[in-house]
Amino acid sequence: MCEEEDSTALVCDNGSGLCKAGFAGDDAPRAVFPSIVGRPRHQGVMVGMGQKDSYVGDEAQSKRGILTLKYPIEHGIITNWDDMEKIWHHSFYNELRVAPEEHPTLLTEAPLNPKANREKMTQIMFETFNVPAMYVAIQAVLSLYASGRTTGIVLDSGDGVTHNVPIYEGYALPHAIMRLDLAGRDLTDYLMKILTERGYSFVTTAEREIVRDIKEKLCYVALDFENEMATAASSSSLEKSYELPDGQVITIGNERFRCPETLFQPSFIGMESAGIHETTYNSIMKCDIDIRKDLYANNVLSGGTTMYPGIADRMQKEITALAPSTMKIKIIAPPERKYSVWIGGSILASLSTFQQMWISKQEYDEAGPSIVHRKCF
């Protein structure tokens, strides 16, 4: 450890799919690992192998063939606290190799996170990890910080949940936040389903990870879905091949854009919800008429599920069709948007003006977990 890191703040962004952790002031997270806890499916027979009863992150991923994988964060909200503790423990001690009792820690949470959840996070940080100070920030707000803005509407779509969060002068407007339980994991499941129609079978939790890789490498968003379907039907120009871990090669055609099209047409997976372009528009329409212009001009994309090629152009086209014809519409898709929540946290935690915002151990001891509602908004 170098000297200046003796009390640097830690930033830990816990997503449904990936946990991003690192030091405030850095421009990227040091540790990015899957938010997975795996437990063996079989009885250990070899003595002295040092088999553990649970594995976290990349180690769970690499041994996935013999484990049952569980995600403690579902739809952006922590549902399994014991496993979550394992993930935090892993990120502090194994990934960052720090003692959490020496570092103020910034955590992130989903918009509209249940109150009891923030309290529980606060309690675990102070009582289990003995942090000297902590803060809980809303993910979408951090993404906006990372893009250098204080006003805009963020479309934050990760592995477990998608949110539209309008923010004005640094304040999220809770009445206009839209939540859509459709994100990367659902797209992976949908891709598994449509690949099955092609005769490729993917079923286990381990095979799902292979499909996720196919999705990340080959999928894209079509500007005009019907046109693209016609092109795919009449020629093989859109086909790509992918080599599976066992050497078998599979071909994928219109699945490449049918999979992410679900974001715009959730009916593909039997959801009654509006697509991401409509939820963005609805969210803007719930805001005060005077600030809508600023929101239309600052549509910020964030999260791994906004990484599909073509998504920004398609959003531009769809929102232009919904909005008043004279409105200037701008979609901002920063190249580092996969990690923009973490980057925003890194910026926030290293601001000198932020230092009085931390919840200190002393304040926690005096007021208890509910302090988090007063200090973090």
UniProtKB/Swiss-Prot annotation:
Keyword set, alphabetical order: Acetylation, Aortic aneurysm, ATP-binding, Cytoplasm, Cytoskeleton, Disease variant, Hydrolase, Isopeptide bond, Methylation, Muscle protein, Nucleotide-binding, Oxidation
PTM comment text: Oxidation of Met-46 and Met-49 by MICALs (MICAL1, MICAL2 or MICAL3) to form methionine sulfoxide promotes actin filament depolymerization. MICAL1 and MICAL2 produce the (R)-S-oxide form. The (R)-S-oxide form is reverted by MSRB1 and MSRB2, which promotes actin repolymerization.
Description of what induces expression: Up-regulated in response to enterovirus 71 (EV71) infection.
Cellular component terms (Gene Ontology): actin cytoskeleton; basement membrane; cell body; cytoplasm; cytosol; extracellular exosome; extracellular space; filopodium
Keyword Protein biosynthesis among UniProt keywords: no
Covalent crosslink: Isoglutamyl lysine isopeptide (Lys-Glu) (interchain with E-272): 52
Residues recorded with modification Methionine (R)-sulfoxide: 46, 49
GO biological process: cellular response to transforming growth factor beta stimulus; glomerular mesangial cell development; juxtaglomerular apparatus development; mesenchyme migration; positive regulation of ERK1 and ERK2 cascade; positive regulation of gene expression; positive regulation of hepatic stellate cell activation; positive regulation of hepatic stellate cell contraction
Disulfide bonds: none
Chain positions found as N-acetylcysteine: 2
Compartment annotation: Cytoplasm, Cytoskeleton
Family: Belongs to the actin family.
Biological role: Actins are highly conserved proteins that are involved in various types of cell motility and are ubiquitously expressed in all eukaryotic cells.
Subunit organization: Polymerization of globular actin (G-actin) leads to a structural filament (F-actin) in the form of a two-stranded helix. Each actin can bind to 4 others.
Further comment found in the protein's record: In vertebrates 3 main groups of actin isoforms, alpha, beta and gamma have been identified. The alpha actins are found in muscle tissues and are a major constituent of the contractile apparatus. The beta and gamma actins coexist in most cell types as components of the cytoskeleton and as mediators of internal cell motility.
Annotated protein name in UniProt: Actin, aortic smooth muscle
Biological source species: Homo sapiens (Human)
Gene behind the chain: ACTA2
